[in-house]
Amino acid sequence: MRSGFVAILGRPNVGKSTLLNAIVGTKVSITSSRPNTTRFGVRGVLHRAGAQAVFVDTPGLHRPKSVLGGRLNERAVGTLRDVDVVVAVLDATAPVGPGDRMVLSSAVSALAEPDATGGLLVAVNKLDRARPNQLVERLTQAVEAVEALAEGAAAVVEGAEFFPVSAVTGQGVDGLVEAVLARLPEGPAYFPPEMVSDLPEAIAVAELVREQLLVRAREELPHSIACVVTEWEWPRIRCEILVERESQKGIVIGVGGEVLKAVGTAVRAQLDEGAYLELFVRVEPHWQQRAESLDRLGY
């Protein structure tokens, strides 16, 4: 059979997590319109007859403004050392810019290493929102950006394939998946057929809490929020929400606790029946800049 690992790489907000969920056919990674929603290397497993592909959703590559941001970039680039194929995701509704070129350069550099195998696939996402002339322009820009990286990586560049897709509607996703599977090496199944993700349950619950907070958060809050499960004794789950300032604590709790109640209700609806979820908010100043805080949070 064919099997292997596939990195989904891109700058923030191009739809990487939505694409992973569309490929696997179920929700394994949280999504949000906020940049840098993904902080962990979430893995989704696709099972097909004679093939198994393990897709890794990576944090968005960006110019970091915090220690956390630097670690997220390191996590994304570090993933490239351990995969067979890279799917670089671009946004069809926005011009190919410096951030996209950084993504493509990182992918091509990793795939040009002597032991690299499967190559580069470029997914131009948000097909459903792009005008036809926009899509043609974006595909042309993507091809030109990859071709500009040919020095020292001619084989990678020549073998690159480009796919217009919509992670929201599913258009073009099957073609992308078939191209991924065709590039995987011969190998064993890494996960049993019933498994679609290997994300630990405690992290998955904490991420669901953060996802619901991002839906309700004001502009200044998303990057200041972290969530961690501190106690798990089923059915009781205790999740701690970290913010950086006292004023943010009040926003997260809401008037009369309305925000926290809404978050808890939305998350419980996604957990197994009987789960008792407790949410607590704690102020930890400058946690994004403190290595010890990031270590404790698993970042």
Which residues does each PLM region occupy?
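Conserved Switch II/interswitch segment of TRAFAC-class P-loop GTPases
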Residues: 80-103, 115-136
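P-loop NTP-binding site
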Residues: 201-299
